[in-house]
């Protein structure tokens, strides 16, 4: 299974599906399922029973995971959606880089 090139906190652009062209921050990464949860994207309605957390129950809207192939990382320096590359620093540390401008994506 290939390693995911996105991390929690990355800004991404949705490139396919019902929420195409929406931007959002990654809230959660699910590496075993190759999916990510993006803030404000793929909102679904869940019908919940009354429970201690939600005493009245009802319909709750929440974000559902989308496949990682449907999102592209937005480079913080050039602001464009880009593919992610890897680069080794002089001290042997591996970082993620923007394929368009070559700048680091890691904070």
Curated annotation (Swiss-Prot):
User: Quick one: a GO biological-process term for this protein?
Assistant: translation
Any one Gene Ontology MF annotation carried by this entry is: rRNA binding
Please list the coiled coil stretches.
none
Keywords of the record, alphabetical order, are: Ribonucleoprotein, Ribosomal protein, RNA-binding, rRNA-binding
Q: What InterPro entries does the entry give?
A: KOW (IPR005824), Rib_uL2_dom2 (IPR014722), Ribosomal_uL24 (IPR003256), Ribosomal_uL24_KOW (IPR041988), Translation_prot_SH3-like_sf (IPR008991)
GO CC annotation: ribonucleoprotein complex; ribosome
Chain's role: One of two assembly initiator proteins, it binds directly to the 5'-end of the 23S rRNA, where it nucleates assembly of the 50S subunit. One of the proteins that surrounds the polypeptide exit tunnel on the outside of the subunit.
Q: Which family does it belong to?
A: Belongs to the universal ribosomal protein uL24 family.
Quaternary structure (record): Part of the 50S ribosomal subunit.
Q: Specify the protein name.
A: Large ribosomal subunit protein uL24
Species the sequence originates in: Carboxydothermus hydrogenoformans (strain ATCC BAA-161 / DSM 6008 / Z-2901)
């Amino acid at each position: 299974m290939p390693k995911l090139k996105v991390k929690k906190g990355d800004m991404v652009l949705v490139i396919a599906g019902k929420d195409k062209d929406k931007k959002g921050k990654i809230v959660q990464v699910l590496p075993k399922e190759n999916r990510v949860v993006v803030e404000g994207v793929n909102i679904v309605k869940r019908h919940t029973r009354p429970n201690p957390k939600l005493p009245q129950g009802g319909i709750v809207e929440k974000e559902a995971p989308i496949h990682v192939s449907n999102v592209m990382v937005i480079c913080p320096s050039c602001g464009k959606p880009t593919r992610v590359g890897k680069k080794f620093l002089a001290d042997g540390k591996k970082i993620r880089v923007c394929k368009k401008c070559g700048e680091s994506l890691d904070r």
